[in-house]
Amino acid sequence: MPKAKYEGIYRSIKKRIEAQDYPYQSLLPSENTLIEEYACSRNTVRRALAELVADGYVQTMQGRGVRVIYQPVGKTMFTIGGIETFQETARRNHLRAVTKVTKFETVIATEQFAAESGFSEGDELWAVQRVRYLDGKALILDINYFLKEFVPGLTEEIASHSIYDFIENVLGMQIITSKRRITVEHATARDEKLLDMDGYDCVAVVVNQTFNSDGMLFEYTQSRHQPDYFCFQDIATRKK
């Protein structure tokens, strides 16, 4: 089955759910209707719907159709189970996104940083610091490290837009897996300087290790979030 076909259908239906063309608790069009609309096979439609189920957007009901269970929320909603770019998250939440690069340099992984990040000591890395604005507020401080061997040609201009878009569509590398750790920490002087803290003295910190299709670590990132706009969502299914 062509991956691009079912992914295109998945993204199309997902976008319509987020736009509330298919509102919460409504039923999606029947399989036959979707097959006709997208000019595809039944298996392709079912694969697209399975992706939406995995994302928590719909729930299948045996013999009764597919019900929408996605609800838009007021806070910025990140997903734990998927890998999204900042721009994709902003679009999904209907927010205006701006990225400002505050540091862009090359560093060498020290023994201490190698133990923390998973890179090897002596690895040459891009070190990128970016402030993420949503609807005009500085809410996220991203501190990224990319292995230069796997991300050649990265520039500050690219970093101000989407590094993942560059990696996937220019370099042709597949981004497959991200391991995440979420904690709460006291805000640092850097957080208070760069983020709109609104009186908070702590930040939510998401640490990511991201791997390509060969299972190689190419990114280590620490994202520091202003708490008032921090909300991560996961989907859990009970198995018996």
Residue ranges of model-derived segments:
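Beta-hairpin "wing" of winged helix-turn-helix
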Residues: A54-G63, I69
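Extreme N-terminal segment that seeds HTH/winged-HTH DNA-binding domains in transcriptional regulators
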Residues: M1-R42
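Short, cationic-aromatic polyanion-contact patches
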Residues: A4-Y6, S30, R67-G81
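C-terminal all-alpha effector/ligand-binding and dimerization domain
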Residues: R96-K240
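Conserved hydrophobic residue
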Residues: Y22-P23, V58, A138
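Short, hydrophobic-biased segments on the C-terminal half of alpha helices
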Residues: L49-A50
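Extended, compositionally biased flexible segments
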Residues: Q59-T60, E84-Q87, R91-L95
